[in-house]
Amino acid sequence: METTNESLGYTDQIIGPVLD
């Protein structure tokens, strides 16, 4: 589960700027 949480954070850093 911890790995999944880190994956979500990693994806958020990528998609965050894209959405902005």
UniProtKB/Swiss-Prot annotation:
Membrane topology according to the record: Peripheral membrane protein
Induction behaviour: Expression shows a diurnal pattern of oscillation across the 24-hour light-dark, with increased levels during the light period (at protein level).
Keywords: ATP synthesis, Chloroplast, Hydrogen ion transport, Ion transport, Membrane, Plastid, Thylakoid, Translocase, Transport
Upper classification of the organism: Eukaryota, Sar, Stramenopiles, Ochrophyta, Raphidophyceae
Keyword Secreted in record: no
Binding partners and assembly: F-type ATPases have 2 components, CF(1) - the catalytic core - and CF(0) - the membrane proton channel. CF(1) has five subunits: alpha(3), beta(3), gamma(1), delta(1), epsilon(1). CF(0) has four main subunits: a(1), b(1), b'(1) and c(9-12).
The protein's name: ATP synthase subunit beta, chloroplastic
Role summary: Produces ATP from ADP in the presence of a proton gradient across the membrane. The catalytic sites are hosted primarily by the beta subunits.
UniProt feature, compositional bias: Polar residues: 1-10
Residue ranges, annotated region (Disordered): 1-20
Record EC number: 7.1.2.2
Annotated catalysed reactions: ATP + H2O + 4 H(+)(in) = ADP + phosphate + 5 H(+)(out)
Species of provenance: Chattonella marina var. antiqua
Subcellular localization, as worded in the UniProt entry: Plastid, Chloroplast thylakoid membrane
GO cellular component, one term: chloroplast thylakoid membrane
Family indicated by similarity: Belongs to the ATPase alpha/beta chains family.
Residue intervals passing through the bilayer: none
A Gene Ontology biological process term: proton transmembrane transport
